[in-house]
Amino acid sequence: MHKRTLIQNATIVNEGEAFLGSLLIVNHHIEEVLRGQNAESVCPPDEVINAQGCYLLPGVIDTHVHFRDPGLTHKADMKSESRAAAAGGVTTVLDMPNVVPQTTTDEALALKEAIAAERCVVNYGFLVGATNENAEFLRRINRRRVAAIKVFMGSSTGNMLVDHEEVLARLFANRRLPIVTHCEDTTLINFAMKKCQAVNGPDPAVRFHAQIRSAEACYRSTELAVRLAHEYDTRLHVAHLSTARELELFDLAAYPKVTAEVCLPHLLFTDADYDRLGARIKCNPSVKTREDRDALRAALADGRISTVATDHAPHLLREKQGGAARAVSGMPMVQFSLVGMLGLVDEGVLTLPRLIETMCHEPARIFDIENRGFLRPGYKADFVLVRPHSPWTLTPNRIESKCNWSPLEGRTFRWRVEKTFCNGYLLYNQGHITDEDHKGQAVTYAR
């Protein structure tokens, strides 16, 4: 049985254009992208949704989330965080490997796949983690099974540090899968922490976090990753740039295989916000200066940075108590990433077509994701309807994440997510998940 649904009279934003039109979907796929007011297909639809006044965007692909499942489900799980994603217009997520057990073996990956198949309401894919000992697993893994290999070149939540130079060289030389790096120099960080503790006590105030996890620590590690990628011709995507200086290392014209991501915390906050928000904005790498934030925004707008992600990393608030040493790093962000970035469009930081490039098109290209990320006939019907000029203020009762807090609480947004369609199914509708038991699909990769 084929169900034909026509989304009519929306402003469609896709592949560098914005135009008034309609979208015809048949079951799980896009059938036609139609231009003009009241555009209709030759074949009559079974249902018409009037989207007048809304923008119709491809579903967001968030390539950097930590849904904490398995093993850390007291703070988040696949069901709760995928609900948050759907409520935010995110239809596909790539989940990171620092869970319990770490996703560094075939058995651990199979467990995670089974959990997601049962509990994830949006589409999902995974990165597997590199360690100093699992080279054989990474050599034989099916390239169409996972998005990339995550390499922690700096220690962070989960303690998956890869610090043997010969292991790093082998990883970059392998070239079977893209590599995504967390780049911070652990030696510099440990030295800075001890120096800060000597003056400020065992748990320095959170405002020292940016000095401890410093710009120099980021630059030194990112420089090594980029140098290895150039040497071995590796497909490298550097996660969560946080400094202006790191931007000097990227030249897409000369090295198109080496790309960069920026995450919401480093676009929305600066070190001036530590006094107000404290450990709620403590993350790794640290939130740094206004100059760094503004440089990252400019690089995102002009194309030097390829993708926006969230680094969605929920913790319970009690785990966020303390200072730079004791409070855990990470914050929930997936539910409000799209409306947060649309706010930057309103501020003139970047255009709406450029935003869609960074949150939808480029994530699909960089990770070889099949049939998602674009509004094209034959592609999966993953899309979101958002309404501008519809202000609302973020309060805890709106939060879907299990941890039930956000560093953005109290902020007023001018855009509202009205409907999220995932594989042609209306999953989120004006404030409500429509089906608690909906199951997303595993991402496939064109390799």
Give residue ranges: language-model regions:
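Active-site metal-binding motif and surrounding structural segment of the metallo-beta-lactamase
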Residues: A39-L56
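Histidine/acidic residue-rich metal-binding segments in metalloenzymes
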Residues: E136-V308
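His/Asp/Glu-enriched, well-ordered alpha-helical/loop segment
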Residues: D203-L224, L228-D233, A301-V308, A313-H389
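Histidine-centered catalytic micro-motifs
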Residues: G59-P70, V180-E184, L241, T310
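Metal-associated gating/positioning segment near the N- to mid-region
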Residues: Q52-R119
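C-terminal cap of metal-dependent C-N hydrolases
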Residues: G323, P377-T444
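N-terminal metal-binding scaffold of metallo-dependent hydrolase/deaminase domains
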Residues: M1-V42
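Divalent metal-coordination and catalytic microenvironments
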Residues: A10, L23, H28, G53, ...
